Amino acid sequence: MIPQISQAPGVVQLVLNFLQELEQQGFTGDTATSYADRLTMSTDNSIYQLLPDAVVFPRSTADVALIARLAAQERYSSLIFTPRGGGTGTKGQALNQGIIVDMSRHMNRIIEINPEEGWVRVEAGVIKDQLNQYLKPFGYFFAPELSTSNRATLGGMINTDASGQGSLVYGKTSDHVLGVR
């Protein structure tokens, strides 16, 4: 049984300072600190529940790089950051009590396909079933088959090296990734 989260704690000032500086430096994504927004990110497909202090939704790799650059500064060294895709992991990997970096809201584009060489370039928030629907006319698909493939993102699959039905034949996620940026 999942224990209930008690009173909604306020957001700590250091997190608010980070978010303010993030926006001042040109962050184009969204930020969220309301209890409702934080509560939606407090669970995944596991039995765990952790209420984050804030959620950021980058729109581009430049936004992700800005988050990383700012987080690396000494004054923010105590903050914890966790990337999140579809929240389909079963071991709590997408949860923390710091800042969630949600890749699924905006960074969900299929950028390029090269059918001759057999590769596709996508953003981390692309959902596996959507990718396979896109690839089908080219005679390709992205393995492995997951029970959560209608909401699992490629970034999350890479993070957990997802495997599932057909993995013995087609391999796990890392067997199909040429590179990440």
Language-model features and meaning:
Residues 1-72, 76, 86-118, 147, ...:
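N-terminal flexible segment immediately upstream of the FAD-binding catalytic core
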Residues 110-113, 122-181:
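FAD-binding subdomain of flavoenzyme oxidoreductases
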Residues 77, 84-86, 152, 176:
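Short, basic and Ser/Thr-rich N-terminal targeting/leader segments
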Residues 76-79, 140:
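Short glycine/serine/threonine/alanine-rich loop segments
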Residues 81-83, 144:
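ATP-grasp fold ATP-binding core
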